[in-house]
């Protein structure tokens, strides 16, 4: 029996060829088998290679979520495990001594919130088991590269290598001559070069030369700067002694007092700015009365020179920018953190749509401080660029609308001013005191609660249908029991009449034939009480029941016969209301 079982086992065992491995009763190339599975159960083996499922990538450990293979071909760069998060996605769970930095397991010794080795170095992990450390780029130093080395200078919070610095003018140190950025280059050896801003500068002698300083060049590059008679410092030529002009092209001549050498000629000082005559866009005219520039078309005289008119905004030349007269036509050059449109430099931090002209600022929901680049939001908005709704507003059709203008009668379909008006901001006494109210269309009335209602449905006290109905197509549809154009009347049950906002049994109602056709309960001198299923008046002590109503004693002219107002009128309060043809206190005088 034992022999038979052994024979069966030998007959059913699978023997895979060399280079293949048995998995679940089948043979697969060993290159596709990981952790005793085929492609980690997240791919298929094709031509001895795992083709991973969507969202997975092939690495040294097989098919794993792509996010866990970001840094190397090892899962979590060999210092962690790929685990499923509580949200269903995957992430690296790093080993002790390592920190997850955007799904890369970084040694704590190299980690900073600003990046690995502060973003200015490489984390070295020795193979001999010694502690990891930061190898800083030449411009940086310190345990985690957070300091500047002796080869660099701290400028605007960054360590700039001295090879990128220029100081053509004593005391005026510029990064790449103020026209570029200092970039690190890894090959062939780590070094720094200037990357010049397009249209502003050209790389020359390891710095950026302002294009307006270039006086000669050929197919191979720049051959002459500032006419070889000066240096280009920033956006201007600083000429050698004895020369002047925008590119040092003129010799200086001796001039009389009040005159200045320009273009190798003497001109009145009133026409000279930056050593040019009228900015190169006009003629200098002078006589015994003085001197001034006659500017070309499109230019205006401004502080001894001719300025391109489009570059002057509110009386200021290129606010927050630099006027570049070397261009044709001249233009405003904005700093790197500003965006230029129509000679205006807008802070980039405020610009929320650069495709419009002028660009949209602060999502059109606030004002931008051009000096600080900070948005001051309207009361309806909040956030760095006013992109969110404040607690005083809600989002409707992409716009933060103030609650004071929102019709909330239908919570599932909020509307602004009921769709029949415009929400207007009104300023209070304080500049920051702003309130919002609906300005309704013609034929509509503004009602508290952001509601615009047809005039025909609103009472004098701005109540819709007297709070007793709904307004539909300009007509009040009254609730049950009410009537009238504004639902102002209450419909009493049969046998009752509406008197003084109450339903009163008709047996107790007194009517008067006066001009106002007034009514009262029991003549105003009693109350209506039930008596064996019917109703009657119960009078005050100074009144008497006569014909079912309470009559004040001052109106009774014969108590024995219950005569009221001499039989020619009715009592209304303390007075007689005489019938036609009679007058007098007790209606006892007949009209002639």
From Swiss-Prot:
Keyword entries, A-Z: Cell projection, Cilium, Cytoplasm, Cytoskeleton, Disulfide bond, EGF-like domain, Flagellum, Glycoprotein, Repeat, Signal
Signal peptide boundaries: 1-19
Single GO MF annotation: calcium ion binding
Domain EGF-like: 64-104, 106-146, 267-307, 353-387, 453-488, 546-588
KW Glycoprotein (keyword) present: yes
Keyword Iron-sulfur on entry: no
Domain of life: Eukaryota
Record-stated family: Belongs to the NOTCH family.
Subunit field text: Interacts with EB1.
Protein name (database record): Neurogenic locus notch homolog protein
